[in-house]
Structure formats: structure tokens, C-alpha cells
Amino acid sequence: MQLDEDLEFAKKIFNPNRAFAKQARIKNMCEYKDLVHEANEDYEHFWGELAKQKLTWFKPFDKVLNSDNAPFFKWFENGKINVSYNCIDRHLKDKKNKVAIIFEGEMGDYNVITYRKLHSEVNKTANLLKNEFNVKKGDRVIIYMPMIVESVYMMLACARIGAIHSIVFAGFSPEALRDRINDAQAKLVITADGTFRKGKPYMLKPALDKALENNACPSVEKALIVIRNAREIDYVRGRDFVYNEMVNYQSDKCEPEMMDSEDPLFLLYTSGSTGKPKGVQHSSAGYLLWAQMTMEWVFDIRDNDNFWCTADIGWITGHTYVVYGPLACGATTLILEGTMSYPDYGRWWRMIEEYRVDKFYTSPTAIRMLHAKGENEPLKYNLESLKVLGTVGEPINPTAWKWFYEKIGNSKCSIVDTWWQTETGGHIISPLPGATPIRASCATLPLPGIHAEVLNEDGTKTKPGEQGFLCITKPWPSMVRNIWGDEKRYIDSYFSQIKLNGEYVYLSGDGAIVDENGYITIIGRTDDIVNVSGHRIGTAEVESAISKHEMVVECAVVGIPDTIKGEGLFAFVVLCDGAKCNLGESLELLKEMNHILSVEIGKIAKLDNVMYVPGLPKTRSGKIMRRLLKSIAKKEPITQDLSTLEDVNVVKEIMSIVQMEE
């Protein structure tokens, strides 16, 4: 895309599709503002009414919000509920034969699970955990599983009997798995023999064996193994048991445990943390309410919709928008075992056509990859079923946004560019597809009931166009409740740096800019903000600008020490296929990229170093490992865990380039 065209495109406002808006839950900005006003007028009444209307309670709550021990807030106090019941049982009267889950395996196999079947399988699994493994309310269960339907059964079975599940992403190393098991003091670990990835078997059980060897996890009593790829594995007698052989002997009737609103539903350890893992603790009622509300508001989920979120269940997006959100709404959710590129880069588009997907939610990294590797693949498929597109995980640059909007959504689907975190449980800032005028790469407005503000360090609001810290200034139901076993770390991490009206507010760790209309644009992590000669520059906006060069497929920018400026900008750049970059071309390309930066951001944003690389190191969830790139740029030893990488060879190739340049 030409720079001038891109600048104009980024300013353009896209109004919701009129036909879609007419039938949407929130049809226009007036209705959005009415909800915001309602929440502001009586905050507790607003949330209390939603909880009464949307959730099924065994015993009603008697207090909406208890702030006596802030920041350890309690929502819907003394209410009794069960998340599994709300995701399955309450739908059985009218939807027992409706499809709950559509599963497609990497090798092309598929399975369709109705709500009745889901109820039966979850109950049998819950009974297995209780009867054979002595799992009780409050026990922690580690789930180290691939994207298969049994993973959902395990989650909901834990919720049914009151156990606290903690999913560890199946790409994590044995060491990372061990750390999480020990921090949670888990009684049981559930894994699979393996899965299929890129058309080949990929093993998981050996990683569990290594994590548990030499009694390294003394809290673990037993391990439960799901047979998926049927490759040979080792068994430890008395410890390892096969799920497939045991589950069908269990009754398909299991009464749901009555849980307090504030009882923990799950722990999820934040990715990329250093030192002791940080177990984000989420509650039952508040989390589920917001999972359901954001499905209804942000995706405008409908009874006959097929919803597909491409995230892995090892991340919060998979928890909320693959499992709990869709099922709480009684919707149909899709699960794909494998990758976007096998057998080719048309896989996702074929699935959208075949399963008539209505709402599609994925990451900017995936969009950029599909654009670069298979730009014309979508043209081979009928994507007319799509009504809403969504992005999650990082800011999306205008070029990727434009391709997603025009080629995938046929210029008729709203893109909900959602901002939220593991700690928030669900969306915080997002357009509403039937109401919000959208702009490329802009998260737009806080959802009703959410008080998200951009503040300076002293707690004052930033002026329009100024960078600041994105904070949430009032508690909300799905917020993180604690860091497992570490209250001090919870306070230090989120409620210790910025005050508003004398009270500490939730600090997200993200930087943002608010414009004169209240629209919020995320500029990246505050630790991804580079201070160049006293000017704070978000690496995300630098990357977005560089990506507008026609030869650049994608890039990652990090800050490096500079004796004059404090910090300088170092870019790792992936060029389009066939592009060659000798010394002369390299200097010319650097000049062109810096020109784009000077136009888009200002002359202060200037690349000091560029390394042209064949690819960027990414986790299997699609996130770029920026800390690793920063170590490379600063010529420091690589100490990061590389086991989560999609392709370790990328790092080896980058290191070879570094050695050649030394």
C-alpha cells in the first residue's frame, strides 16, 4: 500500500453495515450511550440486573459488590452457582440436539458434539475425576492438552465438581509445566499422548514424564492420559491411567457442585513471565457473566450462529471465547486441532465456507501471515456467511486491517478490534458491530460498565493525542481476583502505581492514546515503549508504520541503549518473497523506512539499526518473542525458554546472520 493511501485509509471511518445494525442487540450509538449512562447512574444496580437476567443461580446473591477489602473485590456475594450448569444443563430443555462443538482435526477428521452429548461426556468425565482420582472441590487440576474436544470435557468437568483447572499451553517445555504444577500444588495432571501438527504426530506425554521425573512435583498423585495420536508412549505403573479406557464405565449423571460466586474457576499462568510463574485467579460468577455479555455485545452472538475463535485453550482467549463464552450463550463453537498452513494457507477459509462461520475471531499475527503467504487464497472460497470479524492479542496495523476488512469481510463486516488481557477475563475496549463507527487499528470505546481511562503517572487524564497509561478505574465482575498464593504480588502488579482520587486503580501495563472523540488506540506495552531523547515512542506504532513499506511483510522493533539518545530503535524486518537486499539496497530501504516514520510519527522516530531476517521468532499462539529479539539486539546471551517457539530454526538463522555481521 502506498504511504499516502495508507495515511488516508487510517483516518477513514467505517460505519456498521445497515442491514446488520437493524437486527443487532445494540443498534446505534444512542443505545450504546444509554447503556453507558445506565451503568454510570447506578453502577451496582447495572451489574446486579445483568447477573440476575443472564446467569442461572441456585441461590441468589445478596450483595452486588463488596469493596471493603479493596483491591480484593467480591462480586455477587453469597450467590450460589455452577459454571458447568450454566454452560450445558440450562440449554438442554430447548437445545439438547443443537450442536455445541464442531471439531476438525489436523488430518481432516471431524466430530460434532450436541449439547446432550456434551452433557453426557462432561458428566462421565466429572465422575471419573471424583470416583477414580479423588478430585474434590478446591483441588487443582493441571490440563496439558491439545485442541481436542476432550480438553473442553476436562475444563467443564472440573467446573462441575468444583475443582480449579489450570491449563498449561501444550507447547510449553517440561520445565515450564513443572513450575506451574508446583505453584498450583496440583493433585492431578491431565495430558494426551500427543496430537497432530503440520500433518505429523506431535508428542506431549514425554514432556509430562520429564516434568514429573525424580519426584519433582510431589503434589501430583496421578496422571490421566487421553489417547489421541495413538503413538507409543511410556507408562509409569500406579501413576498413569488411560482416559479412553476408563471414562465409559462412569455414569452420565453427575449433580453440579454448588459453588460460591467467588470460588475460583481457574488459574491461568501468564505467558512470558520471568521468575516464579504468575497464576492469575478468576472467579466463577463474575467471569462467566462477562464472558456471556461480551459474546452478546461484541460479537452479537445469535442462536443459529457458528462462532469460531482460532485461539488455543492454553490462553485466556481460548478459555473465554472458545469455551465458556460461546457455551454460556448456547452457541456453536468451532475447534481446530492444527495450524492455519496445513495442508495449505487456504485451510481457514475452507473451514469458514464449509461450516458457514458467522463470527470469526483471530490474531493480527495470523492475519499478517495469511496475507503474506496466501494473499489470494480467500478468493477460492465463499466467505459470504461472515457477519463479524474480530482481532485480539496485539494492535493490528492498517495494512493487515484493510486486507482483513476487504478480502475476508468483503467490505461489509465490522471488525471488532478488541483490547483485553488475561487479567480482565473478557473484552474491555471494543467496537460494537451494529453501533460503533470504526477506524483501522483503533480499539475505539470502553464497553458499557467499564471505566477505562488513559492517565498520566500522577493520575490526571491525558490530553487528546497524548500517550499515557491505560487504567481501569472501577472494579468489574470478571477482573483478576488474586495471584495464586501471592496477595502481595497481586497488589504490586496491578494496584500500586497510579492513584485516582486517592485510591489505587488497576494498571494494565499498556500504553494508549485517547482522541477528542474518546476513541482509544493501544500503542503497546509500556515496557515496549522506547524513550528516545526524552520522547516516548511505542514500538507498536513504529512497527505499524514500517509495515506500510511495500517490501516489508512484517517486522519487530525493540529499544537498545544509545549513549546520546538514551535509547535507539532496532528493527528486525522480514521482506517479501524474492526481495534481495545487498548493501546499497539495504541503505536505500532504511532511508525509505525512516521517511515513512518521519511522516507518520515524526523525525524523532528513526531506525538506528536494521537486521533483515527470514522470519520472526513466534510462540505457537502467534506472539512475537520480543524479549528474545531484544537480547539479540543488545548482543546478550539468550536465556529465554525456546520450547514455546513455533520454529526454533528461525532463531538459529537470525544468530547466523548476527555472527556474519560481527
Swiss-Prot record:
Function: Catalyzes the conversion of acetate into acetyl-CoA (AcCoA), an essential intermediate at the junction of anabolic and catabolic pathways. AcsA undergoes a two-step reaction. In the first half reaction, AcsA combines acetate with ATP to form acetyl-adenylate (AcAMP) intermediate. In the second half reaction, it can then transfer the acetyl group from AcAMP to the sulfhydryl group of CoA, forming the product AcCoA.
Organism: Helicobacter pylori (strain P12)
Cellular component GO terms held in the UniProt record: cytosol
Gene behind this protein: acsA
Cofactor(s) this protein requires: Mg(2+)
Organism lineage: Bacteria, Pseudomonadati, Campylobacterota, Epsilonproteobacteria, Campylobacterales
Binding annotation for ATP: G393, E394, P395, D417, T418, W419, W420, Q421, T422, D510, R525, R536
Residue list for modification N6-acetyllysine: K623
Any single biological process term in GO: acetyl-CoA biosynthetic process from acetate
Family of this protein: Belongs to the ATP-dependent AMP-binding enzyme family.
Binding-site residues, Mg(2+): H549, V552
UniProt cross-references to PROSITE patterns, sorted A to Z: AMP_BINDING (PS00455)
Modification note: Acetylated. Deacetylation by the SIR2-homolog deacetylase activates the enzyme.
Binding site for CoA: R197, K198, G199, K200, T317, S533
Protein name as annotated: Acetyl-coenzyme A synthetase
UniProt cross-references to Pfam families, sorted A to Z: ACAS_N (PF16177), AMP-binding (PF00501), AMP-binding_C (PF13193)
Annotated EC: 6.2.1.1
Record key words, sorted: Acetylation, ATP-binding, Ligase, Magnesium, Metal-binding, Nucleotide-binding
InterPro entries per the UniProt record, alphabetical: Ac_CoA_lig, ACAS_N, AMP-bd_C, AMP-bd_C_sf, AMP-binding_CS, AMP-dep_synth/lig_dom, ANL_N_sf
Cross-referenced PANTHER family: ACETYL-COENZYME A SYNTHETASE (PTHR24095), ACETYL-COENZYME A SYNTHETASE 1 (PTHR24095:SF14)
Catalytic activity: acetate + ATP + CoA = acetyl-CoA + AMP + diphosphate
GO MF assignments: acetate-CoA ligase activity; AMP binding; ATP binding; metal ion binding
